[in-house]
From Swiss-Prot:
<dbReference type="GO" id="GO:0015990">
    <property type="term" value="P:electron transport coupled proton transport"/>
</dbReference>
<keyword id="KW-1003">Cell membrane</keyword>
<comment type="subunit">
    <text>NDH-1 is composed of 14 different subunits. Subunits NuoB, C, D, E, F, and G constitute the peripheral sector of the complex.</text>
</comment>
<dbReference type="GO" id="GO:0008137">
    <property type="term" value="F:NADH dehydrogenase (ubiquinone) activity"/>
</dbReference>
<keyword id="KW-0479">Metal-binding</keyword>
<keyword id="KW-0004">4Fe-4S</keyword>
<comment type="function">
    <text>NDH-1 shuttles electrons from NADH, via FMN and iron-sulfur (Fe-S) centers, to quinones in the respiratory chain. The immediate electron acceptor for the enzyme in this species is believed to be ubiquinone. Couples the redox reaction to proton translocation (for every two electrons transferred, four hydrogen ions are translocated across the cytoplasmic membrane), and thus conserves the redox energy in a proton gradient.</text>
</comment>
<feature type="binding site">
    <location>
        <position position="172"/>
    </location>
    <ligand>
        <name>[4Fe-4S] cluster</name>
    </ligand>
</feature>
<keyword id="KW-0411">Iron-sulfur</keyword>
<keyword id="KW-0472">Membrane</keyword>
<keyword id="KW-0874">Quinone</keyword>
<dbReference type="GO" id="GO:0048038">
    <property type="term" value="F:quinone binding"/>
</dbReference>
<dbReference type="GO" id="GO:0009060">
    <property type="term" value="P:aerobic respiration"/>
</dbReference>
<keyword id="KW-0813">Transport</keyword>
<feature type="binding site">
    <location>
        <position position="78"/>
    </location>
    <ligand>
        <name>[4Fe-4S] cluster</name>
    </ligand>
</feature>
<comment type="similarity">
    <text>Belongs to the complex I 20 kDa subunit family.</text>
</comment>
<keyword id="KW-0408">Iron</keyword>
Amino acid sequence: MQPTPSQHPVGAQPLIARPATGIIDPNTGRPVGADDPFFLNVNRELSDKGFFVAATDDLITWARTGSLMWMTFGLACCAVEMMQLSMPRYDAERFGFAPRASPRQSDVMIVAGTLTNKMAPALRKVYDQMPEPRYVISMGSCANGGGYYHYSYSVVRGCDRIVPIDIYVPGCPPTAEALLYGVMLLQKKIRRTGTIER
């Protein structure tokens, strides 16, 4: 007769996984963020009361910063660097920044490249299809202010003439690290301003 999975042979110890410790900092040997004042306050409140008290706006803001869905509006060479952000080396999804194909499912639009006068109405149309609250990151010199083509008759001298911009990422083209820093700044801005007031 074979023992069932709930029965163990005499003297054998059941296999029990050790508790999760998180990501260990090799310099200190402690979990990353163990000294963070925010987490210390959360742990203190949970150990005192057994539950956590927060305002609804804080909860919505926390959820929104950790689940930003972005769509690309790639117009030129900066879009190649934007694609690199989703590759394994940078992996923007670990920050809760996941790509979407439809503007109706997106919170953030990244405008990357030279915006021409003919493309400006399309940019505005896509922006208007995004649900509120919506954010725009302008990536690269051309999107920020016309860049190399600033004096061309067919170029819009900055996307902020068409849609409101929340974060400007400079560079020609900006690196994936610069764009990732812009994403983190946007998350910080959302935490600071909230979503209900916007």
